[in-house]
């Protein structure tokens, strides 16, 4: 089970590419509204009806944090979001963040001693991190990726982490990527 946390201002490509490809890999995915409404509006005014409200979101194998401004600051300002992400990491469950969202992991000190990547210019927000030169990287229980342009690689990496190389390759081939 993967929970993708959405706040108003999220980056649509990063969130929806992840949801789509993970579902193609037959991974249970919930789009989780962290707002007061089940509908969340992305940074480019695409409105998405989420599957569940944050208060009703079950425990999961991975929390995915899409980027986007003001989506990332909106996620970061929600104590229930940061508490869940911190608990997820501390229990050695997986977290994934793309674009500006690794900033949240930095604020929670999850990036310390971990190889990560983020949107260029946000590196100083990744406290104690080892900044990767890769566009997408998994280290320990953390998967990160650079930007909307790496959303396909990010989603395929999550599939690889959760279901293995063969399933990731099958999904990749099925979309002719």
What residues fall within each predicted segment?
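N-terminal beta-loop-helix "entrance" segment that forms/cooperates
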Residues: 32-52
């Amino acid at each position: 089970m993967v929970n993708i946390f959405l706040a108003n201002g999220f980056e649509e490509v990063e969130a929806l590419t992840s949801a789509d490809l993970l579902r193609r890999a037959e991974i249970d995915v919930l789009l989780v509204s962290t707002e007061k409404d089940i509908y969340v509006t992305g940074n480019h005014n695409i409105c998405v009806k989420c599957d569940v409200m944050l208060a009703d979101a079950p425990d999961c194998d991975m929390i995915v944090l899409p980027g986007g401004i003001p989506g990332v600051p909106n996620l970061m300002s929600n104590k229930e979001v940061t508490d869940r992400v911190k608990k997820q990491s501390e229990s050695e469950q997986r977290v994934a963040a793309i674009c500006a969202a690794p900033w949240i992991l930095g604020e929670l000190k999850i990036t310390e001693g971990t190889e990560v990547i983020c949107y260029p210019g946000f590196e100083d927000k990744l406290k104690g991190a080892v900044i990767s030169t890769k566009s997408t990287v998994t280290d320990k229980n953390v998967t990160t990726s650079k930007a909307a342009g790496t959303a396909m690689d990010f989603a395929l990496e999550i599939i690889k982490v959760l279901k293995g190389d063969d399933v990731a390759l099958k999904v990749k081939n099925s979309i002719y990527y």
